Design a protein with these regions (language model features):
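C-terminal closing repeat unit and adjoining cap/tail of repeat-based domains
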Residues: 253, 339-344, 361-415, 420-423, ...
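Conserved blade-register residue in beta-propeller folds
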Residues: 97-99, 152, 200, 248, ...
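Sec-dependent N-terminal signal peptides of Gram-negative exported proteins
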Residues: 2-23
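Aromatic (tryptophan-biased) beta-strands that constitute blades/sheets of beta-rich domains
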Residues: 24-69, 95-122, 159-172, 208-216, ...
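Extracytoplasmic beta-rich repeat domains
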Residues: 67-78, 94, 110-135, 163-185, ...
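Loop/turn-rich, solvent-exposed surfaces of beta-rich toroidal or solenoidal domains
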Residues: 288, 309-378
Length: 427
């Protein structure tokens, strides 16, 4: 591993943990607004709780602040305090983490290690570069490398604090498509779907706390999804989607509380599940969408299918707004599903191959894989495209990020940062 420090500057915002009972609610709210520290934002739900968005999206409303060129990556950018973190695969050999100045894009440090790998030939068109979105927690950043390696680096200077090689430690096969899961940090622990299992590590030392949901890994079983934390049936739990099943797991002990097989095509259960009340929504490639109700009675959990419909999700995780999920489908269309009934209230026309989604109020910001940013109305009655603008000449598979009034676009080889304003409000 190589670590190159370019400067030492800035004081880091310490992210309040969602589970803390003593956190200052005012400070915590400010930190939630001012950061995008992990996969799909502060609460891993794809919802932006910061400044209200403008009513339209036009070239005049997006001001390019800076852009930087890198090697290819599918990792979403993460933003904490005055720093931005992004990854790249370099020279088909190294994986690199960059820390950038949020105002200028100037590099502060970079850390690299040998670790790239080739995905199977039939998926080569999808690229063999780093995929997982890092997670920042206080003065540490957790980064997953393709060869089933989890790195813990110091955010100040990129120094490696610990490294966990799941293949070496567990004797499991390499995940055929690389380490895809994005780390989840909560309390004293970091959780990942890696090493042909769900693993809880001590976030300070990298020591294994527990391991569960073991599978065969490799081509057939290595996870594509990322875990979230939710309270379901009165019990706080990890919600974990593997290639074959959906499970609830006790975050402290690793006990599997419940599991539900999710019908799938070749294990293509990819998106991050969505929690609604005591139910869980998921959707599977070339299959269907489901809502499962999780019950908890006399210390026993039960799972019941509430409904299913023919909406076929793929890689895009939906956003939940007012009892409806807005989902981008395998067939490259948007759809809206009423969670109470399972009814698909509308389906749009065609767009790109993939869209990442962020919601706020009655609006959805969607980054189309063709480099087009879309502003949609979260209208359950009809599809409503408010406006759109071209933001990249490259493909944009990495997840969109929004922090304050800034929009972060990670193209295949470029990171762009825009300030999104209302031109009518300018003096």
């Amino acid at each position: 591993m190589f670590c190159r420090i370019l400067s030492h500057c800035a004081t880091f915002l310490v992210i309040a943990r969602m589970a803390s009972a003593v956190a200052d609610p005012v400070v915590q709210a400010q930190e939630l607004r001012d950061s995008w520290p992990q996969w799909r934002g502060p609460q891993r739900d794809g919802i932006h709780r910061g400044k209200s968005w403008p009513e339209s999206l036009t070239p005049d409303s997006l001001n390019l602040l800076w852009q930087v060129t890198f090697g290819p990556s599918y990792s979403g950018p993460v933003i904490v305090g005055d720093r931005v973190f992004t990854t790249e695969t370099k020279d088909k050999k190294y994986e690199v983490v960059h820390a950038l100045d949020r105002k200028t894009g100037q590099e502060i440090w970079q850390t690299s290690w040998e670790g790239s790998m080739n995905v199977p030939f039939f998926a080569a068109a999808n690229g063999s570069w780093i995929r997982s979105t890092p997670a920042v927690d206080g003065d540490r950043i957790y980064v997953a490398g393709m060869r089933d390696v989890l790195m813990c680096l110091r955010t100040e200077d990129g120094k490696q604090l610990w490294r966990f090689d799941f293949v070496k430690e567990f004797g499991t096969p390499l995940p055929a498509f690389g380490f895809v899961c994005s780390p989840l940090v909560d309390g004293d622990y970091v959780y990942v779907q890696a090493g042909a299992s769900l693993v809880c590590l001590n976030k300070m030392t990298g020591a294994v706390v527990w391991r569960t949901l073991k599978d065969n890994g490799g081509m057939e079983d290595s996870a594509f999804s990322s875990p979230i934390l939710a309270t379901i049936g009165g019990k706080r739990q990890l919600l974990v989607q593997g290639r074959q099943k959906l499970s609830g797991v006790d975050p402290m002990t690793g006990e599997v509380l419940w599991s539900q097989f999710v019908p799938n095509y070749r294990g293509m259960n990819i998106l991050t599940p969505v929690v609604w009340n005591d139910s869980v929504f998921t959707s599977s490639y070339q299959n269907k969408s489901w809502l499962y109700r999780i019950s908890h009675d006399n210390q026993q959990f039960g799972v019941a299918e509430v409904w299913r419909n023919n909406a076929q999700g793929y890689m895009s995780t939906p956003v939940l707004i007012d009892d409806h999920v807005y989902l981008f489908l395998q067939n490259q269309r948007f759809t809206c599903i009423d969670l109470k009934t399972g009814e698909r209230t509308w389906t749009s026309g065609n767009f790109g191959k993939y869209c990442s989604l962020i919601g706020q109020g009655d609006k959805i910001l969607a980054l189309d894989q063709r480099g087009i940013l879309l502003l949609l109305r979260a209208n359950p009655k009809q599809f409503e495209l408010i406006s759109s603008v071209k933001v990249s000449d490259e493909e944009t598979w990495a997840h969109l990020a929004v922090c304050d009034d800034e929009v972060y676009i990670r193209g295949l080889n470029t990171l762009k940062v825009f300030r999104w304003t209302d031109p009518k409000a300018q003096p």
